[in-house]
Amino acid sequence: MFTRRAALVGAAALASAPLVIRTAGAEEAPAQLASAAPVDLSNLPRVKHTLVPPPFAHAHEQVAASGPVINEFEMRIIEKEVQLDEDAYLQAMTFDGSIPGPLMIVHEGDYVELTLINPPENTMPHNIDFHAATGALGGGGLTLINPGEKVVLRFKATRAGAFVYHCAPGGPMIPWHVVSGMAGCIMVLPRDGLKDHEGKPVRYDTVYYIGESDHYIPKDEDGTYMRFSDPSEGYEDMVAVMDTLIPSHIVFNGAVGALTGEGALKAKVGDNVLFVHSQPNRDSRPHLIGGHGDLVWETGKFHNAPERDLETWFIRGGSAGAALYKFLQPGVYAYVNHNLIEAVHKGATAHVLVEGEWDNDLMEQVVAPVGLTG
């Protein structure tokens, strides 16, 4: 039984020596695999992708240029300290060093082949659970690796949509690893590309990936956020905050202000921008202040017709959604979680800087502010 005590003992032991921790799913999976018929994919082309940090996406085609391919990805698990806010730090566990992990993009019917690396300097076992995958706990049962190990997982992308992936090493480790930064998104495009509500093809000029995450940083007796030297040192204090279900921070892309100022997203009038938004743990309500969702796949699944002209859409905890908007006016747009307390007080805000010419037909200041006259 994977108890909290076992988790703490394991975390402490890993600080000095590798410890093999396997879930029940991981133990059962190899036996099941041994009896499975082999699959020959040697005739399929291989495409190697270089992942990039969010909010950006790696090079990809919106419409598949050929039949199915094997998409090769590599991700390193990086444990490191990150700064959430001016006075708050997190001993983060990450995919490829970013919160969220990179956006992966393939086409329906393709294969995803991931090499997952847990470097020897890490202190924890990790794995990956793809919500887009079928079987073995989304791959979690086949990918649990200790520091100094790597594993290669291949799965077929059988469903089109945006899907969360996250670390799920078992028991109380699962939520702790997720709120410590270990989540991301994979987008599986239909082979013939996205379609609008009438089934007509649509394209985007830019895709931005916004990964929303909730964090639980404990405070000391003086009300100061605590800072730890490694993940396991802060485990017990962090879990105490997690159990309140009240986050200390709710942020986009790993930190308060990560997507504002120098990190603000950019577009031009006339650009069609696809916003992919994931939240592995809590519900969210994205809203583009000054704009709309022209086409919104609220559940993120592209074979369902998109909704149109939404002001605010809903992202269920543990899922990803997508919204397409054509910018019609220049200026600064705020993309927020429209629980405005979470946007303003917790940090769930991004900015989009749009260049272009103003259209007075859409909006005009008829009279500038003037003093009232008696």
UniProtKB/Swiss-Prot annotation:
Protein family: Belongs to the multicopper oxidase family.
Chain residues that bind Cu cation 1: H126, C167, H177, M182
Location of the protein in the cell: Periplasm
One Gene Ontology cellular component annotation held by this UniProt entry: periplasmic space
Enzyme's top EC category: oxidoreductase
Protein name: Copper-containing nitrite reductase
Domain notes per entry: The type I copper site in NIR plays a crucial role for electron transfer from pseudoazurin to the type II copper site of NIR, which comprises the catalytic center of NIR for the reduction of nitrite.
EC id: 1.7.2.1
UniProt GO MF annotations: copper ion binding; nitrite reductase (NO-forming) activity
InterPro entries linked to this entry: Cu-oxidase-like_N, Cu-oxidase_2nd, Cupredoxin, NO2-reductase_Cu, TAT_signal
Keywords carried by this UniProt record: Copper, FAD, Flavoprotein, Metal-binding, Nitrate assimilation, Oxidoreductase, Periplasm, Repeat, Signal
Pathway(s): Nitrogen metabolism; nitrate reduction (denitrification); dinitrogen from nitrate: step 2/4
Taxonomic lineage from the root: Bacteria, Pseudomonadati, Pseudomonadota, Alphaproteobacteria, Rhodobacterales
Cofactor needs: Cu(2+); Cu(+); FAD
Disulfide bonds: none
Signal peptide positions (record): 1-31
Highest taxon above the source species: Bacteria
Gene name per UniProt: nirK
Biological process, per Gene Ontology: denitrification pathway; nitrate assimilation
Domain (Plastocyanin-like) ranges: 93-189, 254-355
Catalytically driven reaction(s): nitric oxide + Fe(III)-[cytochrome c] + H2O = Fe(II)-[cytochrome c] + nitrite + 2 H(+)
PTM annotation, UniProt: Predicted to be exported by the Tat system. The position of the signal peptide cleavage has not been experimentally proven.
UniProt cofactor note: Binds 1 Cu(2+) ion. The Cu(2+) ion is held by residues from each of 2 monomers of the trimer. Nitrite is bound to the Cu(2+) ion site. Pseudoazurin is the physiological electron donor for the Cu-NIR in vitro. Binds 1 Cu(+) ion. The Cu(+) ion is bound within a single monomer.
Assembly and binders: Homotrimer.
Pfam families linked to this entry: Cu-oxidase, Cu-oxidase_3
Keyword Flavoprotein among UniProt keywords: yes
SUPFAM superfamilies membership: Cupredoxins
Residues reported in the UniProt entry to bind Cu cation 2: H131, H166, H338
